[in-house]
Amino acid sequence: MHPTTELYGRGVYRFLMSRQWVILTLIALLLIPTMIRLGIWQMHRYEERTARNQLVTDALAAEPVPVEKLTAPGHTVTSAERYRTVTAKGRFDAEDEVVVRRRTNSDDEVGYHVLTPFVLDDGKVLLVNRGWIPSDGPSQTTFPKVPAPPSGEVTVEGRLMPSETTAASGIKNLKGLPDRQIMLINSEQEARRLDARVLGGYIAQTAPEPKGDTPELLGDPGKEDAALNYAYAVQWWLFSAAVPVGWVVLARREARDRAQAAAGEADASKAEPAAV
């Protein structure tokens, strides 16, 4: 029998009971389920983002409907209603117009969103985000120069949006702001300010196009990168499969090295001349 084979039979894997290998084995046993759970979590994120992306796609593809078919005073815009294209007929109330601070355009320039009440034929008010304008200066302490909205009776079209909240947006609703400036577009707060029946949520105007391209209309909503979460899930599961494979490879290498070292010692002892 070859010395190496003989040594394997004598329990060369007993080193697995050493402190170092026990710790390594425990770490491997902890890593495997942890990585599997992380993969499952990433897959759930992928499914959630895919579902939200589908809602956006469905909403943008839906036919325009009158705004009062989807919202009313006190109504909370749902995720299925968000981004739906709606139409409304009425007139802009520029006197009660406000600007929303610290908003960026497509080039990440900081400025304002222009929020103009739109009075419907039945007297209710729809909040219309007419788009982005640049800031007059870094302080944003004075009311900026805002392009006038169309006068008289007009029909507007836009994407329905839910009211903004600090919890959902992370934007703090600061107090003591300069006159006619706000931080959040919230229909309940605007209803109190205007003392009017304000439809829940607001719309991001898409038509008519403003004269001179200002305010700058808001672009289509972007979609979340769901594929990235899918890739992360697969990555974590591959890592979890690699752990036991790596453990076996390391253990076999250690056993082989130990067996070869022991065999070398045995051959050396046999080669020594007998004492006279």
What are these regions (language model features)?
Residues M1-P73, S79-V276:
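Surface-exposed, charge/polar-rich loops and edge strands
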